[in-house]
């Protein structure tokens, strides 16, 4: 059975060229059927947000995505999230995958040069997203 990977943008409109590059990369890397879903433009539940840190709880985001999408064993979900997140014991993360590998998330803010006060570099930003997808 061929693996199916669904790219799910959250609060982010995935540019067509990035979507195409990401689909090609994942298809080649995992010999999978890859498709990009319609973006989720709803905020995750606010109880998944840590107000003190001003960051989202990544492991809780993964559980929310799993419950919302219910992928079967042959389907993998990669969420592209336009918000900052952390995992217990870490100040921040660029991305995280769950233990059984059905759902993962990439968090965009810290992949952008502008986050560090540098000039926008979309080419580097896209490369970072593609690298973090695997």
Stretches with model-predicted labels:
Residues 1-13:
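Fold-level signature of zinc-dependent metallopeptidase catalytic domains
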Residues 16-133:
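Metzincin-family zinc-dependent endopeptidase catalytic domain
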């Amino acid at each position: 059975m061929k693996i199916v990977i669904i790219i799910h943008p959250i609060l982010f409109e995935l540019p067509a060229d990035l979507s195409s590059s990401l689909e090609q990369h994942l298809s080649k890397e995992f010999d999978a059927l890859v498709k990009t879903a319609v973006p989720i433009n709803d905020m995750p539940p606010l109880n998944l947000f840590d107000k003190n840190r001003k960051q989202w709880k990544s492991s809780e985001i993964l559980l929310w995505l799993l419950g919302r999408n219910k992928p079967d064993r042959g389907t993998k979900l990669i969420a592209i999230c336009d918000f900052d997140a952390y995992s217990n014991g870490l100040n921040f993360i660029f991305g995280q995958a769950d233990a059984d590998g059905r759902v993962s998330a990439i968090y965009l803010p810290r992949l952008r040069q502008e986050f560090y006060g540098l000039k926008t570099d979309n080419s580097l930003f896209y490369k970072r997203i593609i690298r973090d997808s695997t």
